[in-house]
């Protein structure tokens, strides 16, 4: 099964938003993007080796809120794991029911 047209666009927009965040804030020189699908979920990950941030203090920026709202539209989840000096990993999961 593939992803629906709308979900493909929203996955693209999430990657675009996170890349914008990385370019503006992370000072990263490497980004790894992964997309996989299993019987339960569609999983997207975007990891960078940038300066990181404190997710308890910086989790309400407009970019992060946009990513979380796009995931929530599909009953999905967006999770940011980061610490200052340790880069950032964004993991987004969508229920596989949105594939076609």
Regions found by a protein language model. Give the residues of each.
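Coiled-coil dimerization/phosphotransfer module
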Residues: 1-100
